[in-house]
């Protein structure tokens, strides 16, 4: 379904080079109309929070936690506080300030964790986040390091089958001028704080290059998946979570020519 957007300050049409498997310029391509949209940081932030909170799992506490005791208050006139105490002892129990007592305000399953957003707003936020990947100022503002002259980086779709090893992928990224961002992510890898280290979140790695490929099982996709901070996603599953980690638009992104066509088809728009 095509949407007509009445918007001001549209960007000019942008022509970017298309690179082959060696990093040389093979052709050029006109970016789809979605790359001409202005960047709405407010919408991108809301859409990110909506998608991020949708993944949260509701949690609660045992209603009887801290209450499995026969402790009762001794009353007044004994020179001690009137908190419930274990029989035969003066140890306090049950109340929230006592050791092993109930929690004062435990998390509840009924709490609404998800932040909702309108479908059209979410769609416009995704288009805006895609447009931000062509803005050099926003990409640098996110902290990405690159020496490419134009953004985004576009690869010919034939590259997917021609590169199958990490060494070849590294050579390609060096040729197009984005491998230094992978090194930035590698140097920024650090231990996570808290008990997440025991729960499968031992390290925290910065986000680096995002690959938007039509085939997530292609040799190129398998070659780059192991690189620090690199993500691979298809045009049909591309979302604000990939394009704007943390709600900050302008991720360093690499598309293929076929992926651009699929994105243009997915976000079919009509400009006035």
From Swiss-Prot:
One GO cellular-component annotation of the UniProt record comes to:
ribosome
- Pfam families reported for this sequence: Ribosomal_L4
What keywords are assigned to this protein?
Ribonucleoprotein, Ribosomal protein, RNA-binding, rRNA-binding
Q: Which Gene3D superfamilies match?
A: 3.40.1370.10
> Source organism's superkingdom?
Archaea
Q: What InterPro entries does this protein map onto?
A: Ribosomal_uL4, Ribosomal_uL4_dom_sf, Ribosomal_uL4_euk/arc_CS, Ribosomal_uL4_euk/arch, Ribosomall_uL4-arc
The GO terms this record gives for MF are: rRNA binding; structural constituent of ribosome
User: What are its GO biological-process terms?
Assistant: translation
PANTHER family cross-referenced by the UniProt entry? 60S RIBOSOMAL PROTEIN L4
The family line of this record is: Belongs to the universal ribosomal protein uL4 family.
Q: How does it assemble?
A: Part of the 50S ribosomal subunit.
> HAMAP family attached here?
Ribosomal_uL4_A
Summarizing the function annotation, the protein's role is:
One of the primary rRNA binding proteins, this protein initially binds near the 5'-end of the 23S rRNA. It is important during the early stages of 50S assembly. It makes multiple contacts with different domains of the 23S rRNA in the assembled 50S subunit and ribosome.
Task: Specify the protein name.
Answer: Large ribosomal subunit protein uL4
Source organism: Aeropyrum pernix (strain ATCC 700893 / DSM 11879 / JCM 9820 / NBRC 100138 / K1)
């Amino acid at each position: 379904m095509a949407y007509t957007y009445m918007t001001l300050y549209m960007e000019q049409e942008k022509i970017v080079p298309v690179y082959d498997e060696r990093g040389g310029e093979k052709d050029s391509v006109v970016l789809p109309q979605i790359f001409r949209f202005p960047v709405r940081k407010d919408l991108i932030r809301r859409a990110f929070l909506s998608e991020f909170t949708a993944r949260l799992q509701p949690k609660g506490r045992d209603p009887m936690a801290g209450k499995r005791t026969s402790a009762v208050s001794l009353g007044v006139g004994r020179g001690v506080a009137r908190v419930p105490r274990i029989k035969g002892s003066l140890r306090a129990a049950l109340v929230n300030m006592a050791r092993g007592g109930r929690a004062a305000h435990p998390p509840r399953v009924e709490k609404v964790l998800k932040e909702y957003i309108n479908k059209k707003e979410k769609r416009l936020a995704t288009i805006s986040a895609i447009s931000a990947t062509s803005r050099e100022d926003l990409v640098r503002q996110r902290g990405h390091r690159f020496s490419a002259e134009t953004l985004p980086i576009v690869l010919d779709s034939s590259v997917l089958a021609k590169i199958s090893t990490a060494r070849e992928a590294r050579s390609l990224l060096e040729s197009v001028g984005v491998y230094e961002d992978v090194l930035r992510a590698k140097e920024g890898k650090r231990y996570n704080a808290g008990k997440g280290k025991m729960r499968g979140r031992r390290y925290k790695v910065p986000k680096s290059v995002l690959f938007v490929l039509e085939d997530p099982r292609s040799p190129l996709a398998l070659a780059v998946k192991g690189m620090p901070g690199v993500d691979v996603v298809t045009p049909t599953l591309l979302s604000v979570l990939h394009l704007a980690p943390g709600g900050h638009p302008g991720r360093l992104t690499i598309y293929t020519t076929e992926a651009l066509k699929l994105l243009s088809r997915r976000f079919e728009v009509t400009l006035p």
